Amino acid sequence: MNNLNYFTKISASCAALALMTLAGCASHKPIDYAPTQVESANQAEAWELQGKLAVRTPEDKFSTNLYWFHTQTNDDLTLTTMLGTTVMTLNKTPSQASLQIEDKVYQDSDAEELLRRLTGWSIPVDTLPLWITGQVSAQDEVVAVDEQGRPKEVLNHTGSSPWHVSFNSWQEQSGAELPRLLQLERDDIRLKLQVSQWQALTPKRASQPESTDDKQ
């Protein structure tokens, strides 16, 4: 399993069955978090994203819906067909990454390496949350900024070859400005991420215990 043909076949077969299985698709709602507004995206303690991801290599191309739930320690990514059937799920913690494809689960300590090993392509899941929220990392070289001083072109020097990141357009979501369209290129792979919805989240407080007086 080393190219996108595998996922294209999964997507096609899932689409054929989607009318029967869509009702059984799992909800992605993070029940322990509540929506909130922020002045800047970096203020969000957690967030959820819905959008579209397109992957292109010299051998193939693949387009999918993307759901991403991000906290300060964990990431949950789900790729689905246009009808909502899950193709692949990636769960990442500080110590382990788990990738589920159909009924098989694969694990590795490195999420990007796990994706590369199983699919032949990878997503920079460690740094992408920063780029999604319009920020840059310590390994990033800001090559160009726009008229508002926001990053426009960035080179990320993590790994053997750099990621070239283009912030093509911006939008306002949850009270904050963040990119609407990102393009990432490294060697012969190109990723395009379109952010349709981005919601800042805050942890829900534990409910107060019911007082004795209220029961009388």
Curated annotation (Swiss-Prot):
Signal sequence interval, chain numbering? 1-24
* Pfam families per the UniProt record, alphabetical: LolB
Q: What is the topology of this protein in the membrane according to its UniProt annotation? A: Lipid-anchor
Q: Write down the superkingdom of origin.
A: Bacteria
Q: Where's it mainly located?
A: membrane
A single GO BP: protein transport
Protein keywords: Cell outer membrane, Chaperone, Lipoprotein, Membrane, Palmitate, Protein transport, Signal, Transport
Per its UniProt record, what Gene3D superfamilies does this chain match? Lipoprotein localisation LolA/LolB/LppX (2.50.20.10)
An annotated GO cellular component: cell outer membrane
Could you list the residues that carry lipid attachment of the N-palmitoyl cysteine kind.
Answer: 25
Q: Where is the lipid attached (S-diacylglycerol cysteine)?
A: 25
Q: Quote the subcellular location field of this record.
A: Cell outer membrane
- The coiled-coil segments of this chain are none
Q: How does it assemble?
A: Monomer.
| UniProt record similarity statement | Belongs to the LolB family.
Briefly state the protein's biological role.
Plays a critical role in the incorporation of lipoproteins in the outer membrane after they are released by the LolA protein.
Descriptive protein name? Outer-membrane lipoprotein LolB
